[in-house]
Amino acid sequence: MATTVTAPVANQIALAAKYAPFLDEIYRQDSKSAILDTANQFVNFTGANTVNIFNLTTVGMANYDRNAGFVPGDANGTWQPYVLETDRGRSYMIDVLDNDETLGMAFGSLLSTVERQHVIPEVDAFRFAQYASGAAAGNVTTETLSAGAATIASIDAATVALDNAEVPYEGRILFVSPTVYGLIKAGITRMVMNGENNVNYGVEIYNDMRIIRVPQPRFQTSITLNTGTTSSAAGGYSPTATTGKAINYMIIHPTAVLQVMKHYVPRIFSPEVNQEADAWKLNMRYAHGAWVLSHKTNGIYVSHA
């Protein structure tokens, strides 16, 4: 009994370990928000669902007295807790014969398909909605952009607002919808020759800000995560009714946000271990969170419809 159970379980652990780097590579390639991932050295986990991030507050300069010397000032460092809001998952099964008849491609394709079609878009949408709702009130603009010149003027005004808030110039990232990206191209006169008969009108950087295009379904001010049960069996996410607005563009300085993927591991069960059916079983679960740091809300600027 011990022999027949232990070997398959060990095999499934090995399979999960094998697929984990593969899934991480897909995430890095396809995610639009991965560029904002928080460095692990700045994050401290406490318990199952709490993330602590170090926050340092100081006071400003004071007059120096030649007799009394320096005026004392406070420098306080604290760990601020953030609770993971999102714990998502789904279970899938591929019949053993279906998998055999496709030379194992059915199960192998399942992993990449789930990640590309469901996990990555939902994680992106959740993060951008969190950042849109967490931006300082004065950094949120409602507008309809339909011309290149007006779009460029709007983005320039946004950068001025960030400049005045003393958000660092270096490292800002300009996330744009596909429509706004087209308007940016229309508003800028330039052309790059990439070899014979090859002309490129693309824009990768604007005013030192890297441009990242985000599909509009992932780019909403508010989303609803569907339960995946009877009332919303398809699962996934959708723009929140009435409050979910299409984002035109968003400028984010990475230091203004915190995003963490706490748990993202596939659990794989072979037909020998699966007690429910003669099938390969895949359980996908991921717990994550995204926040705008309370003292850096000016580090985000949002334009939405």
Named regions from a protein language model:
Residues 67-73:
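Short Gly/aromatic-enriched secondary-structure transition segments
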